[in-house]
Amino acid sequence: MAKLDFDRSKPHVNIGTIGHVDHGKTTLTAAIATVLSKKGLSEARDYASIDNAPEEKARGITINTSHIEYNSEKRHYAHVDCPGHADYVKNMITGAAQMDGAILVVAATDGPMPQTREHILLAKQVGVPKIVVFLNKIDMFKDDEREEMVGLVEMDVRGLLSEYGFDGDNAPVIAGSALKALQGDPKYEDIIMELVQAVDDYIDEPKRETDKPFLMAIEDVFTITGRGTVATGRVERGVLQLNEEVEIVGIKPTKKTVVTGIEMFRKNLKQAQAGDNAGLLLRGVERTEIERGQVLAKPKTIIPHTEFEATVYVLKKEEGGRHTPFFQNYKPQFYFRTTDVTGGIKFQDGREMVMPGDNVQFTVTLISPIAVEEGTKFSIREGGRTVGAGSVTKIIK
């Protein structure tokens, strides 16, 4: 099968299907790809090829996810679908597959179920901006009751979105049957096109990483005799010009410096941008004043913090996690970008312990300040092995 060329002329958007088990997320994913393939905008994909999701690792955690890509008339989409509920939780918390928007699949025959609620909450916590709703399996209703039943479920789902801080009143809700569309029923194929149109119109194009303020996590530091100190790392976001000011943030008191040289692959550059692995020569910085785990950032755009709330997934024993629960006095290492920092945890909601496999919220207090902000991802480690993954939901101090 000829591979589709990656078309850079169309804006790129990352989306995913979320929702309760067996409500039809994977069938819908296959239906979108298949219906668009008839218009020459995608490769056709069957259910089995998506359901048989390959394993990938993110932050030391194994996650099963399927990635498919397709084009609408105006955009290029990367679409992620996960087979199991735990995979969704891990995927969203680790940011393995960033979502600019999500399609919430709800079986109209069941209405919202526990994981429907959990996925909406997770989407909110990890910063998914907008949700489009697909009410699935409407072909299961008799003709005379379909409209009423679908209307009731739609009201429920809109209420649920609003409850978790999404725009329940204005979110597009499309009702159809993923299975019928996949089987080639023209009426239901048209509904899939309607859904794609709703995603095109309602989910905003993400702000490109290069438009955000410059940030690079420091991976290594060395001295070049006669020239000064060089910090290397991958630029997380933004663009840096030669001779611009940056701040060294985290662990030690924040310090300002000027970047007098930018190198990549042994070549001198005038600028570094998101995605580059670069070496930055820093004016007037001693080798002892800077270390792995700090970040270089555009001045005043990020400050170090020691206390925050987080949403966390704790690995099961089978995933290489702990075999036993942990309690309030647990003090693991929190791994941010390039470094481990010890921290203490305080449970919310009156719980006494956290079991392997739990998805929980708690407050973390680090022993030294680290450059973090809402949405920053981290792993929790114990003796070098990953036992959990988290995302900062709220800064306390």
From Swiss-Prot:
The segments labelled G5 in the record are 177-179
Q: Name the residues that bind GTP.
A: 19-26, 81-85, 136-139
Q: Which GO terms describe its cellular component?
A: cytosol
> Where mainly located?
cytoplasm
Query: Keyword set for this entry?
Result: Cytoplasm, Elongation factor, GTP-binding, Hydrolase, Magnesium, Metal-binding, Nucleotide-binding, Protein biosynthesis
Name the segments for region: G3. 81-84
Q: Which HAMAP family match?
A: EF_Tu_B (MF_00118_B)
Stated role? GTP hydrolase that promotes the GTP-dependent binding of aminoacyl-tRNA to the A-site of ribosomes during protein biosynthesis.
For this chain, the family text in UniProt reads: Belongs to the TRAFAC class translation factor GTPase superfamily. Classic translation factor GTPase family. EF-Tu/EF-1A subfamily.
Q: What is this protein called?
A: Elongation factor Tu
Source organism (scientific name): Metamycoplasma arthritidis (strain 158L3-1) (Mycoplasma arthritidis)
